[in-house]
């Protein structure tokens, strides 16, 4: 990479750090290309992304962002996972690390909050925004559905009684 490419990469990574809801930093020593591709595809499916960056460039890109507190995590072979949904990147990274012990989560950040490895794991155990929205909609819809069932039940019962009475008269 020449200087111009490095500057462009640093500015791009800086924008990614500023826009993301959460960032996860992990060591990936020993992961095969297939495993790394699998991690990238799972993260992409969750709406996030995975990047391998030189530690020095990542530290420069962190300057001026809320996530600046995680710059000390960039030692060794590090990979950065990030997503707009604050739960998506930690959830995918933790699930992948459970199945593959070569991905070691070092920590991360959510906004200005710096997280250690346990913080990332506890963040991953929370439901995602979509799951929370689905639960909220379900809670709102349940009373309306019950009300609809209760109001339609008497009409249905009357229709069944009239139908039974009509069948009884036809049989007689």
From Swiss-Prot:
One of its GO terms (molecular function) is large ribosomal subunit rRNA binding. InterPro entries: Ribosomal_uL10, Ribosomal_uL10-like_sf, Ribosomal_uL10_bac, Ribosomal_uL10_bac_type, Ribosomal_uL10_CS_bac. Keywords: Ribonucleoprotein, Ribosomal protein, RNA-binding, rRNA-binding. CDD domains: Ribosomal_L10. Gene3D superfamilies: 3.30.70.1730, 6.10.250.290. The keyword Ribosomal protein applies. NCBIfam families: PRK00099.1-1. PANTHER family: 39S RIBOSOMAL PROTEIN L10, MITOCHONDRIAL. Belongs to the universal ribosomal protein uL10 family. Part of the ribosomal stalk of the 50S ribosomal subunit. The N-terminus interacts with L11 and the large rRNA to form the base of the stalk. The C-terminus forms an elongated spine to which L12 dimers bind in a sequential fashion forming a multimeric L10(L12)X complex. This is Large ribosomal subunit protein uL10. The lineage of its organism: Bacteria, Pseudomonadati, Pseudomonadota, Alphaproteobacteria, Hyphomicrobiales. The gene is rplJ.
């Amino acid at each position: 990479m020449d200087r111009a490419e490095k500057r462009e990469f640093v500015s791009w990574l800086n924008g990614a750090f500023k826009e993301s809801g959460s960032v996860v930093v992990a060591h990936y020593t020993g992961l095969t290309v297939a495993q790394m591709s699998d991690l990238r595809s799972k993260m992409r499916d969750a709406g996030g992304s995975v990047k391998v960056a030189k530690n020095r460039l990542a530290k420069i890109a962190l300057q001026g962002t809320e996530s600046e507190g995680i710059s000390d995590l960039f030692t060794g072979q590090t990979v950065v996972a990030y997503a707009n949904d604050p739960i998506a990147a930690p959830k995918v990274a933790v699930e992948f690390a459970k199945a593959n012990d070569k991905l070691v989560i070092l920590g991360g950040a959510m906004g200005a909050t710096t997280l250690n490895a346990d913080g990332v794991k506890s963040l991953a155990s929370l439901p995602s925004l979509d799951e929370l929205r689905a639960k909220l909609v379900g809670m709102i819809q349940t009373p309306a559905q019950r009300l609809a069932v209760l109001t339609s039940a008497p009409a249905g019962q009357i229709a069944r009684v009239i139908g039974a009475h009509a069948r009884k008269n036809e049989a007689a």
